[in-house]
């Protein structure tokens, strides 16, 4: 029984290490996409994007649009959002916040540095919004970190892999 466990664990380790290797090496020859290329790949259209609001509790909402969702807290100290999508839809996001009683965005918390969660910083920062992020997320945002999407496949793209 002890040997069977060892064989199982060894097999699991070897099988999972291939995915780690692929993640670390897949982007060496892959073409990097800019934001326009990524939005086209995901089928996102900022112009036709609608922001949908859902109330979670008094003063607490979630906004759905394109990419990551946005948490919104309305309180006596102002409006706090968690994640902020893209500058191209910020006017729609701010309109949705206004519709629920907020005025502007006072604080934006970034959960992480991915473009669909933090790219809106580029619109909010110049407006005076206080932006909060973990120091590692800040480093990745400042360095223009690359997201390896080579392991992300949809049924439509499974036969057309470029990674």
Please provide the spans of the model-predicted regions.
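Metallo-beta-lactamase
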Residues: 106-116, 137
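Bacterial N-terminal signal peptides
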Residues: 10-17
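Conserved beta-strand hairpin/beta-sheet module of binuclear metal-dependent hydrolase folds
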Residues: 52-96
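Conserved small/polar residues in nucleotide/adenosyl-binding loops
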Residues: 153-158
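Metal-dependent catalytic neighborhoods of phosphoester/phosphodiester hydrolases
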Residues: 118-127
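Bacterial N-terminal signal peptides that target proteins for export
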Residues: 1-8
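Surface-exposed loop and adjacent secondary-structure segments within mature catalytic domains
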Residues: 131-150
């Amino acid at each position: 029984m002890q040997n069977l466990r060892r064989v199982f664990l060894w097999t699991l380790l070897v099988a999972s290490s291939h995915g780690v290797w692929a993640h670390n090496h897949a982007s060496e020859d892959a073409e990097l996409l800019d934001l326009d290329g990524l939005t086209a790949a995901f089928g996102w259209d900022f112009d036709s994007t609608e922001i949908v609001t859902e109330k979670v509790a008094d003063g607490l909402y979630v906004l759905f649009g394109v990419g990551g969702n946005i948490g919104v807290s309305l309180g006596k100290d102002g409006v706090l959002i968690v994640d902020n999508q893209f500058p191209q839809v910020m006017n729609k996001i701010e309109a949705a916040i206004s519709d629920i009683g907020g005025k502007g965005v006072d604080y934006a918390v970034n959960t992480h540095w991915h473009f669909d969660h933090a790219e809106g910083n580029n619109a909010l920062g110049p407006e005076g919004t206080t932006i909060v992020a973990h120091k590692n997320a800040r480093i990745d945002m400042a360095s223009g970190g690359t997201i390896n999407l080579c392991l992300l496949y949809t049924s439509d793209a499974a036969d057309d892999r470029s990674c």
